[in-house]
């Protein structure tokens, strides 16, 4: 995390305009991704019979209702984070165990859908951005994912990083790269959020799913134990170990998704 802060400070000194624009892109993507995640929990809970989130004003796109300061900071610097959990009352569920599982997975499902939708839009944009010769050359080499997968050190990586001039000569509609950058970031952040929330650590969604689906609600930790686990988990996040592991998983999944959507380019 601290190396990320140092990099941002250095970039502000060497390229202040570009760094500020990047931070604005990141802020928009973080807000949207976290809000969608939490609203999905509340909406599914409402459909399952629990109106708590709606009654407390959490079924809204207002970021002030959702953002957690520490989770947002982690999202900016670590690309993984969290928002304020949507309040639910499982006692209102029509089918306690089934509905608890559905609500737990709702945020993850919403982020995965946003990732896939963003990649679909990015694929359409790639068809509009790059010259036909470039697309044909990549197709012949079996490398069309280079236009979508930010982990490939390729066209998508450059667009994601805002380095438009590097391949500007190969673009027929260069200004669309600014639009595609937003959707590539949305794809990466939503995938990262989905994978991160699958971790079986309280208070993440993966823990709630594990508790209900595997242990049938028997993981009754006391508040002190939960607090200790969360503190240890934060230290693991800040150490960078978890970030490297999640990047490996995200890269693998992004490769699969990119291969699928590259077929329409």
Regions flagged by a language model, labelled:
Residues 1-265:
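Hydrophobic transmembrane alpha-helices and their immediate loop junctions
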